[in-house]
Amino acid sequence: KYMGELNGHPLEDKRTEVISGDIFELVAQSNERFDAILLDVDNGPQAMTDAGNQRLYSTAGIMACRRALRKQGCLAVWSTKPNKTFERLLTGCGLKVRRYKVNAYPGNHSKSFFIWVAAEDENILPSDEDKWTPPRAKREGDNTPD
């Protein structure tokens, strides 16, 4: 319901192809290159409800996505909450990253969620700085990893 309203009902577009299967296998084995890969799998890179989804958020999964993208392509990853370890993984895989805090749809039990947008070329990342939430500054005595 909400995705169609937000995106101009892409499933009604004759150019849309829906593939049902394992996204890890698709990106790892595809000879095609994509303009965008959007991951809304499980609860994001933490709190898996299906342990099999974890490999998608591993170095191998992110590198498979990176290889499947066109040079000017971008990867977007939805999550229930921010995750510094995952942000470091994205940058460690050679991607430039911005994290956005986004409002949940009306009636959802959560007020907001997070989306990382990552690309090799920082210039193609969305520039809506109002929604960008930079990593929290480390405070004295804070032992939380950056």
Predicted regions and their residues:
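Short, surface-exposed acidic/glycine-rich loop or hinge patches that mediate macromolecular interfaces
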Residues: T80-K81, Y105
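Short linear functional motifs in flexible/disordered or boundary regions
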Residues: T49, V77, E87-L89, H109, ...
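Short alpha-helix
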Residues: K81-C93
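Glycine-centered, small-residue-biased loops immediately flanking beta-strands
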Residues: G73
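The AdoMet/dcAdoMet-binding core of the Class I SAM-like
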Residues: K1-L69, V77-W78, C93, V102, ...
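SAM/dcSAM-binding transferase cores
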Residues: Q29, F34, T91, R98-D146
